[in-house]
């Protein structure tokens, strides 16, 4: 058992924020502490303090740690019925209101399934009209996987046969996304809790991530998302992430998953 666990963890969160810029206090403490403690025990460190000393010196360990605190569960068109609503109900509205290039942000994009799903949807719905997709995540290693765009069949269960054949090249046991979809996406490292949010988006997609944030962390993220949307732009979130008072952020409810900037 790690001695003085509570005191040690509080010290750890302070120095991680000060030296690494990661604010663990904005994640739910019980879940985050349990996850980090399990990792420390696995790595055979005695205290959070000892672990932090090595974390600052070991780039590989730091990458592992960032991967640990990042939630990376994704698939193409996850919860397909909600993507159908996006394509058939929300996107036509955005296209009607938007002028010029349609700007989309896939926030906390994990290994790329979400932004590539957006690119496939845009390709068939927008046609020759220009669009730009920004895809961001906290973890550099997971972003590298997203750029490569190679996936196992289990990650593609929601895809139709036509989508598999038109958007991917089969490579043995894996599927490689076609280059034209990669070219339409800008991948970038971004921390939702601390980094600057670009402005002027027509659509922001951030699903099944904020459930791991504290109330304060969620409030900050929703406020910044609202500021990043153009008037009439839409925020698409996960089914368990309902915004209780959207008007506080200048948003109005389209349904439980879509919020429009008023």
Swiss-Prot record:
<dbReference type="InterPro" id="IPR050903">
    <property type="entry name" value="Bact_Chemotaxis_MeTrfase"/>
</dbReference>
<feature type="binding site">
    <location>
        <position position="114"/>
    </location>
    <ligand>
        <name>S-adenosyl-L-methionine</name>
    </ligand>
</feature>
<dbReference type="GO" id="GO:0008983">
    <property type="term" value="F:protein-glutamate O-methyltransferase activity"/>
</dbReference>
<comment type="function">
    <text>Methylation of the membrane-bound methyl-accepting chemotaxis proteins (MCP) to form gamma-glutamyl methyl ester residues in MCP.</text>
</comment>
<feature type="binding site">
    <location>
        <position position="74"/>
    </location>
    <ligand>
        <name>S-adenosyl-L-methionine</name>
    </ligand>
</feature>
<dbReference type="InterPro" id="IPR000780">
    <property type="entry name" value="CheR_MeTrfase"/>
</dbReference>
<keyword id="KW-0949">S-adenosyl-L-methionine</keyword>
<dbReference type="GO" id="GO:0008276">
    <property type="term" value="F:protein methyltransferase activity"/>
</dbReference>
<dbReference type="InterPro" id="IPR029063">
    <property type="entry name" value="SAM-dependent_MTases_sf"/>
</dbReference>
<feature type="binding site">
    <location>
        <position position="72"/>
    </location>
    <ligand>
        <name>S-adenosyl-L-methionine</name>
    </ligand>
</feature>
<dbReference type="Pfam" id="PF03705">
    <property type="entry name" value="CheR_N"/>
</dbReference>
<keyword id="KW-0489">Methyltransferase</keyword>
<feature type="binding site">
    <location>
        <position position="137"/>
    </location>
    <ligand>
        <name>S-adenosyl-L-methionine</name>
    </ligand>
</feature>
<dbReference type="Pfam" id="PF01739">
    <property type="entry name" value="CheR"/>
</dbReference>
<feature type="binding site">
    <location>
        <position position="78"/>
    </location>
    <ligand>
        <name>S-adenosyl-L-methionine</name>
    </ligand>
</feature>
<feature type="domain" description="CheR-type methyltransferase">
    <location>
        <begin position="1"/>
        <end position="262"/>
    </location>
</feature>
<dbReference type="InterPro" id="IPR022642">
    <property type="entry name" value="CheR_C"/>
</dbReference>
<feature type="binding site">
    <location>
        <begin position="207"/>
        <end position="208"/>
    </location>
    <ligand>
        <name>S-adenosyl-L-methionine</name>
    </ligand>
</feature>
<feature type="binding site">
    <location>
        <begin position="191"/>
        <end position="192"/>
    </location>
    <ligand>
        <name>S-adenosyl-L-methionine</name>
    </ligand>
</feature>
<dbReference type="InterPro" id="IPR022641">
    <property type="entry name" value="CheR_N"/>
</dbReference>
<protein>
    <recommendedName>
        <fullName>Chemotaxis protein methyltransferase</fullName>
        <ecNumber>2.1.1.80</ecNumber>
    </recommendedName>
</protein>
<dbReference type="GO" id="GO:0032259">
    <property type="term" value="P:methylation"/>
</dbReference>
<keyword id="KW-0808">Transferase</keyword>
